[in-house]
Design a protein with these regions (language model features):
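Short, conserved catalytic or interaction motifs in soluble domains
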Residues: 24
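C-terminal motif of bacterial Sec signal peptides marking the signal peptidase cleavage site
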Residues: 20-21
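Hydrophobic helical h-region of N-terminal Sec-dependent signal peptides
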Residues: 10-16
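Bacterial N-terminal signal peptides that target proteins for export
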Residues: 1-10
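Residue-level hotspots at or immediately adjacent to binding/recognition sites across diverse folds
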Residues: 32-368
Length: 368
């Protein structure tokens, strides 16, 4: 087995062993202003545990609006709320009982996409238009060496999914109709030996506006950002300063998000040294071309993060197995919430409607 493939599988195994998107801000319940930012900084978030209806480990979450959110996890599990989390409807996709849905993209109360990870045919994309009552298999990977980690969407019908490199090439796929997926790997820079991403929260990809997209990588190679400004027709690769290149192939970028076309944040770490506070957070002000280190996340390796709103606030919420924390200033300072353990992913629709998910079916609503 090639070293890169073995390291990628080892990193996936580490994630499994630890127990191991296009957000809609069109309907915030109040305007986002500097006063609101100051108020949020003073009082911090309100965190409310909710009942998910499942005990499966939840790894993906997408907040569509203040009422609708979708989550996904192991054992082919998904769940959806249409009332702000007061109730959740959980289910298992037929035929996917052995799969891990590491990413979910909600469109509405009725429509969503799920992505499962794994080598070969375990990497799949499912789609529902009836609230999860039935699911169509849209894509099933046929390359035994490809491993799809996450996806991101610009619109309900336009998105892309990332696979780790195979023989120096990233077999990224794209949909322009919400039904079929085409390989656009020739549009991307060459993959470095041993370069891959981490499927820790379904947020190794991000999409913003109508055409901008980003992919965060790591593994045995450098931790790079792959970026497009034209909907995936062309991509460029940019270096980042976070921890990377660990010989075990378990370090790099785990999660990335953008609040506008230029300003974004990424985070990650090293799975082998998961609890160590390393250079694990960086931010950009030029669309991902250059990155500067921010204050390290206080609980070690970051699995997922999200801006509280895509409408302008620099506030960020980040989660890890060792604790969660939020920053009012894009990573300059972190406010710790150490009592919340084993969380994998977080997503906000607006400052009043965010959710984080984790082990044993945990869901917590977050409101600033």
């Amino acid at each position: 087995m090639p070293r890169a493939h073995a390291s990628r599988l080892a990193a996936a195994a580490l994630l499994a062993a630890t127990g191991l998107s296009c957000t809609d801000d069109s309907n915030p319940s109040s305007p986002i202003t500097a006063d609101l930012a100051q108020m949020a900084t003073k009082r911090g978030p309100t965190l409310t545990p909710q009942t998910s209806g499942t005990t499966a480990r939840l790894i993906g979450v997408h907040a569509v609006n203040q009422n609708v959110a979708w989550v996904s996890g192991v054992g082919g599990t998904f769940a959806v709320t249409t009332d702000g989390g007061a109730t959740w409807h959980a289910g298992v996709v037929p035929g996917a009982e052995a799969l891990e849905f590491r990413d979910v993209e909600g469109v509405s109360a009725m429509e969503a996409y799920l992505l499962s990870i794994g080598s070969g045919s375990d990497s799949r994309i499912y789609h529902t238009t009836d609230g999860g009552e039935s699911w169509d298999l849209q894509f099933q990977n046929a390359d035994p060496d490809a491993f799809y980690d996450c996806f991101a969407f610009w619109t309900p019908n336009r998105g892309f999914a990332y696979s780790d490199g195979v023989n120096g090439r990233f077999p990224v796929i794209r949909t322009t109709d919400g039904e079929t997926w085409q390989d656009i790997g020739d549009n991307l820079p060459a993959a470095q030996p041993g370069e891959f991403a981490f499927a820790s929260s379904g947020t190794c990809t991000a999409a913003q506006g109508g055409k901008r997209g980003w992919i965060g990588t790591g593994g045995l190679g450098d931790a790079r950002i792959l970026a497009t400004t034209d909907g995936g027709d062309s991509w460029a690769a940019y270096p980042t300063p976070i921890v990377q290149g660990a010989p075990e192939g378990a370090s790099g970028i785990f999660t990335v998000d953008f609040r506008d076309p230029n300003r974004g944040i990424l985070a990650g770490g090293d799975l082998v040294r998961e609890s160590e506070v390393l250079p694990n957070v960086a931010r950009t002000r030029d669309g991902g071309a250059t990155w500067e280190l921010a204050t390290p996340f206080p609980f070690g390796t970051v699995f997922g993060l999200s801006y509280v709103s895509k409408a302008g606030l620099p506030a960020v919420f980040a989660v890890a197995r060792g604790g969660v924390a939020w920053s009012p200033d894009e990573g300059d300072t972190w406010h710790e919430l150490p009592d919340f353990l084993d969380f994998w992913a977080v997503s906000f629709a607006n400052q009043h409607a965010g959710w984080m998910v984790g082990g044993e079916g945990r869901i917590v609503k977050i409101s600033f």
